[in-house]
Amino acid sequence: MTAQDIVKSFAFISLERAELLIKYNDLVMEKNKVMNLTGIKDLQESMIKNIYDSLTVYDKKYFPEQGRILDLGTGAGFPGVVLAILRPDMQVVLMDAIRKKLSFIQEAVELLCLRNVEVVHSRAEDAAIQPVYRDAFDVVTARAVKSLPVISEWALPFVKKGGFFAAMKGPGAETELGESQSILHCMHASVDAVKELTLPSGEQRAILYIKKNGVTPTRFPRKAGEAERHPIK
């Protein structure tokens, strides 16, 4: 499959958006030669395992018009920059604790003339207690960030009541979901849908759409590192 074939396999992508996605992939791969943005080194492989993979989280049901997205632990901008390209009407916050990756993203979004992106350098536990970010997003995404009990504690405080956390997982998602029932209960959250899929390269993926039904208790998230050391299962 060519880069064009990969992005055009999604019917909701216009030609203009497809070209921006391809250009972003090119920028990531070029920068990856001098900075470790992603373990993937091949341009075509990145189109599948980064761009295509990021697009799979998109479902119009969970991404309202003029809404706000937070991509937690955005890394090289997947899926956050991809979603910002796809939905220019939505405001997208890209958050990560690694400043150098965010510096690259800032440069890249300026080159792509994306006006709907904000880059935030912070740990999730610190940002989630700030009023400007808490209970503020229609959808929060996280791609391959920690186990589900941990990332749920970090992500759900950012989600508005009635909004969604979209956890992008690989094989073993059902096991992680089974281990997350206690934290989801504490967070007043429940699973709305599970989307299973296979990438063109053959890897299995699962996306868990978790709905936030009530306000997050003030004790969450716990202090930095606590969710990793003592996950609530």
Which positions does each model-derived feature cover?
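Class I SAM-dependent transferase core
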Residues: 1-70, 100-117, 225
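Short loop/edge segments at beta-strand edges and connector loops
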Residues: 41, 121-123, 193-195
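Conserved SAM/SAH cofactor-binding pocket of Class I
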Residues: 55-146, 152
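Helix-to-beta-strand junctions that scaffold the AdoMet/dcAdoMet cofactor pocket
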Residues: 87, 159-161
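Short alpha-helix immediately C-terminal to the canonical SAM-binding loop
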Residues: 101-103, 173, 177
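Short "lid" loop at the C-terminus of a central beta-strand within the Rossmann-like core
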Residues: 125, 147, 170-174, 198
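Conserved beta-strand signature within the Rossmann-like core of class I S-adenosyl-L-methionine
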Residues: 162-172
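SAM/dcSAM-binding transferase cores
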Residues: 178-233
